[in-house]
Amino acid sequence: MSPSQSPSVAQVQIESHVFPPTVKPPGTSKPFFLGGAGERGLEIQGKFIKFTAIGVYLEDSAIPSLAVKWKGKTAEELTDSVDFFRDIVSGPFEKFTQVTMILPLTGQQYSEKVTENCVAYWKAVGTYTDAEAKAIEKFIEVFKDETFPPGGSILFTQSPLGSLTIAFSKDGSLPETGTVVMENKQLSEAVLESIIGKHGVSPAAKKSLAARMSELLKEKPEAQTAAAAE
């Protein structure tokens, strides 16, 4: 799918932050489309408090790749399918995740929570090795001195080859290059897994992804007409 054929999708607004329909992430020259977006929050004393807004962008080739198995499924079917989100996380296409602060957060707070989720997942599936332990140490180091005000963002560009490009933005703009590139496929996938996986921290982002991708994966009317004529 060439850039001129990028899928037509709408922006998503969460609180005051707008995720545009397409972006060019740090560390890649390709435009990505907005797969879905949602908040991450917690119920505190009976009130739902939103901490971050999360947008998940996908390379255009995600659509034909996912269509093989998921074309024609309803939003509900996709929302309830662990395998669907696993196929997004591990699929042979690039992904870009933007985590934008609604409330202020320190890099240490963020990295500790993410790595805790990653390690728990790896231990559960039996894939936690020395390489992952070293990657976790480096990940925590990258975030150690960072602070994120409301509107600040953490940016992850995930390559199917195994690299994870991490960048930061304090003003909503996207830098052209990353702050650091980490070469660990498990960590690269685990960051997105921790958001939209089986125990993902943003059910709202999962629901948005499922609804929007269900529409994008529907057969084109022309294809249906052709099939009916055969």
UniProtKB/Swiss-Prot annotation:
Feature type site, description Important for catalytic activity: Y110
Pfam families associated with the record: Chalcone
One Gene Ontology term from the biological process aspect of the record: flavonoid biosynthetic process
Binding-site positions, substrate: T52, N117, S194
Family: Belongs to the chalcone isomerase family.
Note: Part of the biosynthetic pathway for all classes of flavonoids, a large class of secondary plant metabolites, many of which are brightly colored.
Descriptive protein name: Chalcone--flavanone isomerase
Designated gene of the protein: CHI
